[in-house]
Amino acid sequence: MATASQGKVTQVIGAVVDVQFDGGLPAILNALETVNNDKRLVLEVAQHLGENTVRTIAMDATEGLVRGAPVTDLGGPISVPVGDATLGRILNVIGEPIDEKGPVSGDSTRAIHQPAPTFAEQSTTSEILVTGIKVIDLLAPYSKGGKIGLFGGAGVGKTVLIMELINNIAKVHSGYSVFAGVGERTREGNDLYHEMIDSGVIKIDNLSESKVALVYGQMNEPPGARARVALTGLTLAEQFRDQSGTDVLFFVDNIFRFTQAGSEVSALLGRIPSAVGYQPTLATDMGALQERITSTKAGSITSVQAIYVPADDLTDPAPATSFAHLDATTVLSRAISELGIYPAVDPLDSTSRILDPQIVGEEHYNVARAVQGILQRYKSLQDIIAILGMDELSEEDKLTVARARKIQRFLSQPFDVAKVFTGSDGVQVPLEKTIASFKAVVNGEYDHLPEAAFYMVGDIEDVIAKAQRLAAQAA
């Protein structure tokens, strides 16, 4: 018969497995272990059903699992290896390496379910994190230890922007990064790994000198793995924060898939769906993850989360729930990507809590607001231009439109990671140069330069050089 820590499988419904224990029941969120097709299969307790039965979510495929199979209670939540041993490695949701580089050495492990830091432990200082990307640093700056959302539909450049941020910040940053690939394409995960090796972020010959740990639960994984892999990545990031006391960067691509996986298992667990078919616990699940991503007195976690927007609808419950937790939002717009302007960041929709004169300074704030003012005026004139044409505008409005079109193009920038598409080297622009360049454009100092000179360049010196090249070609 089954003992206290031993149970047996009584029912298998896809990713959900019922297990009966005749002795003491394992606690909610405890990890259970069984063997399926000669492979270790981890289950996580989700519900107590009565009659000594628990309902669990499987962290891997359940094909081949049969009723009566023995199950062992591990006595605590899923625990994963943490610390320097994970640097340069790719782990799955239960902390097993999937990069064929042997087992993860090191003996420190940590449970993936942890309480959020208390108010007393949290740090409240605000400081800008410079990314080197003009449109972000100027109009929606990121704060150290903040949570940043990258919103966008399919194919507008979320993953490319995340890769550029890893590239820019990991190179100039002494801290560690953790990348959690949640329910995204395996090909992209593979590309990212090789790109990190090429750029030196992962040192394949000496893994301990690497700056990043990767945790993957891709599209082909069962929903249990996709619903928990973000927590596994966050657990690694928390350990780096607590042990090294530095600013840790935590990238999630894509937080929507975390919600999607939760909704897939929710119906199997017998919960009545909420709005648009999502799980009724949507806000609770999101809060449990997001509240752990924070700065403490020991160090900080700055997180950048790609958020897929289903059908480009920002009012969908999944992206709308994540809005509440963010310090800055970077909204990627299909209309801007159709103009060929990359990064396709919407300068009027993107926001930041720290775009405040007391944090970023008067000059930065005033230049950012002036840029947004000109772009907003251009947006409101577009209907008139479409119906009546440019000739019907006043001289002042014509000047505003000309400046707005230059600013729009000046907000584009070549990326290092997109060199394969563009053929041009990426540029990182220091914050002071970004502010000075846009201040000069807003004040009309470069009204005489052609629009084309502002497209896909770094600071204003690059614009002047490009204008001279264009003039020489035209001559």
UniProtKB/Swiss-Prot annotation:
Provenance organism: Cereibacter sphaeroides (strain ATCC 17025 / ATH 2.4.3)
Superkingdom, taxonomy of origin: Bacteria
UniProt-recorded name of the protein: ATP synthase subunit beta
Enzyme Commission number(s): 7.1.2.2
Topology versus the membrane: Peripheral membrane protein
Family: Belongs to the ATPase alpha/beta chains family.
Keyword Cell inner membrane recorded: yes
Catalytic function, reaction form: ATP + H2O + 4 H(+)(in) = ADP + phosphate + 5 H(+)(out)
